[in-house]
A protein has these predicted regions:
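Negatively charged, low-complexity tracts enriched in Asp/Glu with abundant Ser/Thr
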Residues: 1-20
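Generic preference for hydrophobic/aromatic residues in regular secondary structure cores
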Residues: 3-5, 25, 67
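Mixed-charge, Lys/Arg-enriched low-complexity segments
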Residues: 44-92
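Short aromatic-glycine-(Arg/Gly/Cys) micro-motifs in beta-strand/loop hairpins
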Residues: 26-50
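Generic detector of leucine side chains in alpha-helical contexts
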Residues: 1, 13, 32, 39, ...
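Generic alpha-helical secondary structure signal
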Residues: 12, 22, 37-40, 72-73, ...
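Periodic aromatic/glycine/histidine/acidic cluster detector
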Residues: 20-26
Length: 92
């Protein structure tokens, strides 16, 4: 079981196609936190991945998720809207 603890709007104007995406933070039954982005980024193989982060606190999971997102968009300079996909609204 996981409980949604928080949802954050993250503004990133340099790489993201719309300047903003969301991160949800979940807490599991062991008290650990996981963050997931609602934006998915293409990798070198053409597969899409969302940013995922972990932590012992809500804040550390959020920071780790943002760091993972920035790592996902660091492998090339010129990003197009087609390089991103959005999670289903019902999933987020």
């Amino acid at each position: 079981l996981e409980k949604v603890i928080a949802e954050f709007d993250v503004w990133e104007l340099n790489k993201s196609p719309y300047g903003k995406f969301k991160i949800k933070i979940f807490q599991d039954t062991k008290g650990l936190y996981t963050g997931y982005s609602n934006i998915q980024v293409i990798d070198e193989t053409g597969s899409f991945y969302c940013a995922v982060g972990y932590g012992d606190t809500e804040e550390s999971a959020l920071n780790d998720t943002i760091k993972h997102y920035l790592k996902l968009v660091s492998w090339k300079e010129d990003w197009q809207e087609s390089d991103f996909e959005w999670s289903e609204g019902t999933d987020f």
